[in-house]
Swiss-Prot record:
GO annotation terms (biological process): translation
A GO-annotated cellular component: cytosolic small ribosomal subunit
Entries under Pfam families matching the protein: Ribosomal_S18
Lineage of origin: Bacteria, Pseudomonadati, Pseudomonadota, Alphaproteobacteria, Hyphomicrobiales
SUPFAM superfamilies, sorted: Ribosomal protein S18
Description of how the protein assembles with itself and partners: Part of the 30S ribosomal subunit. Forms a tight heterodimer with protein bS6.
Record's protein name: Small ribosomal subunit protein bS18
MF GO annotations: small ribosomal subunit rRNA binding; structural constituent of ribosome
Protein encoded by which gene: rpsR
Family per record: Belongs to the bacterial ribosomal protein bS18 family.
Length: 82
């Protein structure tokens, strides 16, 4: 006879699927002049935060990176935070 353990059965943890903050009806547009928006996607060290952390879609992540690089080139954002 097989013994039945008395340990409680754990339900699997379901992580809520993140949605892209730039998709949808009233989503903000990615613009290199909008420094406040771009700073939310830059780390404390000045690096661009990856999309797996920010949940930005692949297409919008490329647009975001291009806007950040453009703003850096124009001097609106720093390359390195000192």
């Amino acid at each position: 006879m097989a013994e039945v353990s008395s340990a409680p059965v754990r339900r699997p943890f379901h992580r809520r699927r993140k949605t892209c903050p730039f998709s949808g009806a009233n989503a903000p547009r990615i613009d290199y002049k909008d420094v406040r928006l771009l700073q939310r996607y830059i780390s404390e060290r000045g690096k661009i935060v990856p999309s797996r952390i920010t949940a930005v879609s692949q297409k919008k992540q490329r647009e975001l990176a291009q806007a950040i690089k453009r703003a850096r080139f124009l001097g609106l954002l720093p390359y390195v935070v000192s």
